[in-house]
Amino acid sequence: LQIPLPDASYDVLICNHLLEHVADDRRALGEFYRILRPGGWGILLSPVDRSRAATFEDDSITDPAERTRIFGQYDHRRIYGRDYGGRLREAGFEVREIDYAARFSAEERRRYALPDDWIYVVRRPL
């Protein structure tokens, strides 16, 4: 996987529910880091099962029905756990993990259909 863009060519990066689909997410993160300029920032959203300490992935699971049963969707390759932010840090990013929905009451979360997903804001250090 190589993104056909020059190094340090973007100020902002948004990745919304992509990394769970790619074969080598760490390499993809490395590419995101490479194309983001120093001081640039991004939002990297993925489904994270906060009840899991560690990400679960098994490349031997290729059957779509089995992937759906295990990962929740036929085209997912992993289930991220609470270590997701750590994966982003391993790529070199500074990471802020924001539990956005926590600022709302249970009633407000229901009324506005706010998911329990966290927001991961990354920054490439200067």
Go through each PLM region and give its residues.
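S-adenosyl-L-methionine-dependent methyltransferase catalytic module, highlighting the catalytic core
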Residues: 23-126
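A short SAM/SAH-binding and catalytic strip from SAM-dependent methyltransferases
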Residues: 11-23
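A short acidic, Gly/Pro-enriched loop at the edge of an enzyme's catalytic core
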Residues: 2-13
